[in-house]
Amino acid sequence: MKLTCVLIAAVLLLAVCQLDSADATGYMRKNPSLRSPKRTRGCKSKGSFCWNGIECCGGNCFFACVY
């Protein structure tokens, strides 16, 4: 029972993270100035702990920056 609850919580967390990063990607697509290489100054590198995909240079977050 505990394992089932943990798996459900993990899947829900992953879904929220994916929806959040998808929204950020759409926003960057609408505003071309955000896609410039200069924007990487304030972002976190691959392997850094994150809460949101916007924090990562690659835009993908799953507890740590993926790219």
Curated annotation (Swiss-Prot):
Pfam families named among the record's database cross-references: Conotoxin (PF02950)
Disulfide bond sites: 43-57, 50-61, 56-65
Expressed in which tissues: Expressed by the venom duct.
Alphabetic keyword roster: Disulfide bond, Knottin, Neurotoxin, Secreted, Signal, Toxin
InterPro entries in UniProt: Conotoxin
Signal sequence coordinates: 1-24
GO CC aspect terms: extracellular region
Top-level division of the source organism's lineage: Eukaryota
Cell location: Secreted
Coarse class of the protein's main subcellular location: secreted
Family: Belongs to the conotoxin O1 superfamily.
Domain free text: The presence of a 'disulfide through disulfide knot' structurally defines this protein as a knottin.
Name of the molecule in the record: Conotoxin Cl6.6b
Naturally occurring in which organism (per UniProt): Californiconus californicus (California cone)
Source species taxonomy: Eukaryota, Metazoa, Spiralia, Lophotrochozoa, Mollusca
